[in-house]
Amino acid sequence: MADLTSRETSPSPDHVDETMLIRRAPREVKVVPYDPAWPQRFREEAERLRAVFERELIYIHHIGSTAVPGLAAKPIIDILPVVRNIDRVDCLNGAMVELGYEPMGEHGLSGRRYFHRRYCRDGAEYHTHHVHVYESGSPMIDRHLAFRDYLRAYPDVARRYAALKQELAHLFPYDIESYMDGKNAFVKVTEHAALAWWQRVLVVVLSGPVGVGKSAVANEVSDSLSSAGVPHALIDFDALTQCYPHLPGDRFGNGIGYANLAGVWRNARSCGARCLVIARVVETREELDGLRDVVPGADIVVVRLAASLPVLAERVRMRERGHGLEWHLRRAAELARALEQAAIEDCLVQTDGHAVPEVAREIIERVMRPALPGDLASMLT
């Protein structure tokens, strides 16, 4: 079982079925050294689960102690599928049974669907896989991912946790309740620290006039982060505003844009994203309020991309055609002057004479490496 479920609580009375009437063998509490084969066991099982969940599946995580390299654990693979609609998971119970799982409903945690695979040998019960299904946006996803990633980022904490589990397994080899109770205080303290740490999200806003290359640079930054393994989301805000009609008085569609951003970020966060790169024009600090509503408590850094007016005009001509060209040329010049006068950026990056990869590298080195949490910054090469 993943560490944050505390214990396998009994289902509510309306979930009782005949399988609960069978006297169960005692569960052996066995904590073993980390096995490098665990990630592969997860990947193999994830492939089987993908075939079951199909279009309902958004992402699938390896969670719990077996997902933390070097951490001693009970040899149980904990898996967290993120789905679009939790209620539709009930229709998949038959397919899960065919994979050898026992459907347990919510099993004491509202909004969850829980399945386990187990067997009995020599009078003892052994679990091999636990599957905890949640709908995208569930706070329980944050709890599981925060706890896992915190232990990955802080090996000293993971070592203390391993020592505690090994001691408890020795004291209570066939008493899972006492084993879980013994972990409870450590888990609560660590979870509190992990969630505070998890909430530290870096949001990098790439601002600048029309034609300066915001989207191209944002894509290059995202490619670099992806290559380094940094979990993040990339969003072009203008694409989220493309809805007609706009709310009267909302000329640029910020209302629908922020509503769409909230949905996209919710899904990205449930997939494990810990950083947001967003391309959009920001003319005032007040325009960032909607972003703060979507990502509360985030560290927001505004990067203004700048270019000389002749270079800007050349770039606009390269990308715009037809009757809209003259408007975009005027708008680019207006925005360039307005953004320079407002000077609300935290970092100014001149783009004249620099290729897109060079600009992206400057942003990563000047902005992201210093501002990202240490475990993510260390991934950047």
Located regions from the model:
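Metal-dependent nucleotidyltransferase catalytic core
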Residues: 34-49, 83-118
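Glycine-rich phosphate-binding loop used to anchor ATP phosphates in small-molecule kinases
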Residues: 256-296
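Conserved lysine of the Walker
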Residues: 214
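Small-molecule kinase domains that catalyze NTP-dependent phosphoryl transfer to phosphate-bearing small molecules
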Residues: 321-365, 369-381
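Active-site nucleotide-donor binding segment shared across nucleotidyl transfer reactions
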Residues: 48-90
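Helical scaffold of the NTase/Pol beta-like nucleotidyltransferase catalytic core
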Residues: 2-61, 196
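Conserved substrate/cofactor phosphate-moiety recognition/catalytic segment
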Residues: 219-263
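Conserved phosphate-donor/acceptor-positioning beta-strand/loop module used by diverse small-molecule
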Residues: 281, 297-317
